[in-house]
């Protein structure tokens, strides 16, 4: 459980489409893991859809990243879902993704390459545009 007893899971592609965006995302793993977030890498490959579920009562599904670029510059879309059957279906999809993913451990994250460690803070400067 994350801080406050909340079950937070972050599922990311095992094979990212842009190495530099992945490097920025990965730079936050240590802090997320420290606060109890479970970070997963989807091993079959790429994930692009975004979904958020809150207490099995509401969900967001769409293409939009939760960032400045998606909300201000790009034309992304998503829907809020309040239907119990749709939320249960989404939960089944999320569980399937977790079943086909590997959990990123604090130890694994700490062993990332020196090159990534050098690039992370530099690329974070440009994160708002990625």
Please give the residue ranges for each predicted region:
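PLD/PLD-like phosphodiesterase catalytic module centered on the HKD motif
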Residues: 1-130
